[in-house]
Amino acid sequence: MDIQSYIKDNVKNLIPYSSARSEFKGNEGIFLDANENPYGIYNRYPDPYQKNIKKKIAELKQIPENHIFLGNGSDEVLDVLMRIFLEPKQDSLLIFPPTYGMYEVLANINQVKIYKISLNLDFQLPIQEINNFLKNEQPKMAILCSPNNPTGNSLENISEFLDIFRGIVVIDEAYIDFSKQPSFLSYLSQYPNVIISQTFSKAWGLAGVRVGMAFANPLIINYMNAVKYPYNISLPNQQILEKSLNNPKKVQKEIQRILENRDFLISELAKIPWVKNIYPTDANFVLIEVEDANFIYQKLLEYPIVVRNRHSQIPNTLRITIGKKSELKKLIKEIKNINKSL
């Protein structure tokens, strides 16, 4: 597949912004090039390419540094990809609801036509339906979410989809660290049209730091670096992230605690009469079907406990994030009180 042919013409011809300091190699020097204040704690612009962080990520993920892009959250990753590949009012995006709502929001911002094919009853890709659709339409990009938000399950037939789709494919793996399914990272060399998006917001506990990752072939990464804003990851956030990357064992321990808490929550929810279904999950949340999602959601707010009402996407469902054990015990206690009032 010729990836270059999928790049928008204006992006191909883009001359990216280059700071004077990008020509300087080293850490020490008298910097009089960027009109910075010579005083202050964070008076210098951060490394626009986050080289130290990418080196650590490359070691952790076992992937070359030139295959890595860092964005201001995964939303920037997705937005940059749309700006590289999708021509406004001309190209189209294929998504598979129920899924993460920002895909549609970003497509609308970028004036991109959206095609939707619903996941099947098991929340898997309906390959035959997709195949029939692709006989008549050819979206330029597709986004798959695995594990999927809000359903929680991993998509089992991604390879089958890649065999029939001729375009750019983004696999959103925001929740992959909680899954028994392996990341698609090891298959990148086989699929030059695939970009994998991951995040530090979930398993790494750094949602407030706002750093997302993209992994792709170097051609795509080069275009992403050209299109992004020059200093998209602030220096304090780079420092926090680098410190966290120095201690991946701590993250693994926290993931294990979350998985144990997830098992606890599922076992307790199974005892509640009005919980009609607990969907299988590979994420740090559980989707449940209840008798009256709107009523239960409002009752929980009184305690106050905030869950996510997904009734608009999947009838009578609530998405519950796996919190601390003490928080989940409080949730179960109040749920039992709601049970008495139903």
Predicted regions and their residues:
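Short hydrophobic/aromatic beta-strand micro-patches
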Residues: 215, 287-289, 321-323
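PLP-dependent aminotransferase-like
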Residues: 51, 87-144
